């Protein structure tokens, strides 16, 4: 029995959510999506028994909280980190042919899903054990570590089941995307309208309540135009607000920009149409990879601190290149003045790795010209004036796809870096993720609504 078979067998025996017998209506899907979101938000608000703010140690890492949709010191401490990490690893293993699974068959898809679920559980157990040890290492109560670990394992597995419930058709989209978007929107909303600060989750008083306070008290408004305070590094400012609005408009425009390739179909001879390739061909995948890599390094650096100071120091130095500004430095344009060298290193590392991961993702995820050419031929799509030969079509597509892959990776990396430098609300990566996920949900809602209005379309699209 191979590694994949072992994981798949393990996944089959885990508690699971069954698919609905009949396809739920859009209203029902929205209801279950809302229920899943409420359950997740409640878990993100319930503190872990036996863990206090004084012995939790990741309160300064806003980036981790956003990428993993986690909430410090709560039942959602791990967030969707194990699910994301296992998914990325499985995609890489299958895409690079290190594990042979035919994802075009129902059996292959099922095997992949079960293996991914089992690997996520392994990560849940490992990370829960590490957190349980670090959170309770100062206590003499031998039962407390076990209690914390059990809480984390159960809560994290419930989050996994919530994601599974939504993906299997009870809800809309995926739980991973939904929880990430909810976490980011919470941060952005709080940065605008929060009336109190929540130090444990890096949530300051919002910009607008602060603006009202400054006006009524007659204080100098220049202080909230640009945050230069090291005592309140997460305090939002006016420049960050303007940058958030401006970059939101830019990202929405780019997400809706397509490059069109002229094609014909074998079924409709003589009729020409186009196949759209999104300008952001790899979407936000590159910045997710870079952020997850940095967050994981930072996480293990913090966990290693209680085991080996030297190992923790090395990992921390590496992780610092992935995040900016450093701890205690204002999250605003002022950070460029305080630490210009760190800003340059961060920009170089983030942009270069975004390009590297973006180009790798094209081959790993089946977005490469060869795979796309084969799919076009199977669908009966041809390029006018060219023979129906996979190699010829592959050569033509390669001119578009690799250029789009490079520039889209470069652009999303640049957007994330510039957004971070300008102090956008929710961080640069968070804003990029929130908008792309929101656009996906908008298109999904429009699709589902159209199918409900015109039932005949269900037969045409095979639903």
Swiss-Prot record:
Stored Gene3D superfamilies: SecY subunit domain (1.10.3370.10)
Complexes and interactors: Component of the Sec protein translocase complex. Heterotrimer consisting of alpha (SecY), beta (SecG) and gamma (SecE) subunits. The heterotrimers can form oligomers, although 1 heterotrimer is thought to be able to translocate proteins. Interacts with the ribosome. May interact with SecDF, and other proteins may be involved.
The entry's keywords: Cell membrane, Membrane, Protein transport, Translocation, Transmembrane, Transmembrane helix, Transport
Intramembrane residue segments, as ranges: 61-68, 69-80, 81-89
Keyword Transmembrane attached: yes
Membrane topology recorded in Swiss-Prot or TrEMBL: Multi-pass membrane protein
HAMAP family linked: SecY
Segments crossing the lipid bilayer: 21-47, 61-89, 111-134, 143-167, 175-193, 237-258, 284-305, 342-361, 405-423, 427-441
UniProt-listed InterPro entries: SecY, SecY/SEC61-alpha, SecY_CS, SecY_dom_sf, Translocon_Sec61/SecY_plug_dom
Family in the record: Belongs to the SecY/SEC61-alpha family.
Gene that this polypeptide is encoded by: secY
Primary location recorded for the protein, binned into one broad class: membrane
SUPFAM superfamilies the record matches: Preprotein translocase SecY subunit
Function of the molecule: The central subunit of the protein translocation channel SecYEG. Consists of two halves formed by TMs 1-5 and 6-10. These two domains form a lateral gate at the front which open onto the bilayer between TMs 2 and 7, and are clamped together by SecE at the back. The channel is closed by both a pore ring composed of hydrophobic SecY resides and a short helix (helix 2A) on the extracellular side of the membrane which forms a plug. The plug probably moves laterally to allow the channel to open. The ring and the pore may move independently.
Protein name: Protein translocase subunit SecY
Annotated compartments: Cell membrane
Stretches of the chain found on the membrane's Extracellular side: 48-60, 135-142, 194-236, 306-341, 424-426
GO CC annotation terms, alphabetical: plasma membrane
GO biological process entries: intracellular protein transmembrane transport; protein targeting
Keyword Heme: no
Disulphides: none
Cytoplasmic side stretches: 1-20, 90-110, 168-174, 259-283, 362-404, 442-463
């Amino acid at each position: 029995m191979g590694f994949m078979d072992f994981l798949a067998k393990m996944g089959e025996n885990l508690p699971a959510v069954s698919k609905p017998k009949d396809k739920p209506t859009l209203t029902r899907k929205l209801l279950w999506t809302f229920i899943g979101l409420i359950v997740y938000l409640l878990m993100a608000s319930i503190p872990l028994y036996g863990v206090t703010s004084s012995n939790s140690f990741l309160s300064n890492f806003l980036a981790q909280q956003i990428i993993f949709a986690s909430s410090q010191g709560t039942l959602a401490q791990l967030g969707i980190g194990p699910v994301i990490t296992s998914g990325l690893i499985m995609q890489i293993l299958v895409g690079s042919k290190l594990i042979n699974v035919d994802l075009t068959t129902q059996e292959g898809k099922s095997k992949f899903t079960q293996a991914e679920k089992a690997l996520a559980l392994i990560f849940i157990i490992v990370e829960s054990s590490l957190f349980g040890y670090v959170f309770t290492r100062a206590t003499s109560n031998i039962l407390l570590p076990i209690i914390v670990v059990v809480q984390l394992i159960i809560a994290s597995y419930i989050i996994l089941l919530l994601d599974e419930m939504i993906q299997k058709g009870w809800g809309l989209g995926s739980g991973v995307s939904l929880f990430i978007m909810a976490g980011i929107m919470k941060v952005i909303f709080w940065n605008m309208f929060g009336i109190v600060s929540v130090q444990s989750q890096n949530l300051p008083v919002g910009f607008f309540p602060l603006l009202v306070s400054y006006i009524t008290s007659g204080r100098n408004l220049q202080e909230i135009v640009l945050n230069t305070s090291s005592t309140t590094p997460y305090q939002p400012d006016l420049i960050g607000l303007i940058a958030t609005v401006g970059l939101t408009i830019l990202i929405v425009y780019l997400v809706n920009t397509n490059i069109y390739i002229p094609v014909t179909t074998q079924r409709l001879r003589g009729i020409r149409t186009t196949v759209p390739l999104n300008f952001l061909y790899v979407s936000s995948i590159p910045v997710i990879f870079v952020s997850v890599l940095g967050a994981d390094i930072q996480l293990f650096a913090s966990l290693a601190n209680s085991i080996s100071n030297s190992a923790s120091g090395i990992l921390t130095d590496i992780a610092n290149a992935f995040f900016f500004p450093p701890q205690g430095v204002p999250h605003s344009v002022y950070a460029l003045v305080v630490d210009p060298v760190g800003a340059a290193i961060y920009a170089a590392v983030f942009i270069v790795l975004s390009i590297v991961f973006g180009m790798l993702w094209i081959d790993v995820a089946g977005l490469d010209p060869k795979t796309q050419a084969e799919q076009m031929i199977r669908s009966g799509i041809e390029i006018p004036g060219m023979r129906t030969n996979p190699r010829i079509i592959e050569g033509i597509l390669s001119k578009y796809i690799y250029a789009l892959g490079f520039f889209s990776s470069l652009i999303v990396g640049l957007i994330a870096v510039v957004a971070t430098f300008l102090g956008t609300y929710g961080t640069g990566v968070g804003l990029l993720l929130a908008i792309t996920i929101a656009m996906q949900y908008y298109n999904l809602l429009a699709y589902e609504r159209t199918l409900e209005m015109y039932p005949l379309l269900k037969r045409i699209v095979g639903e």
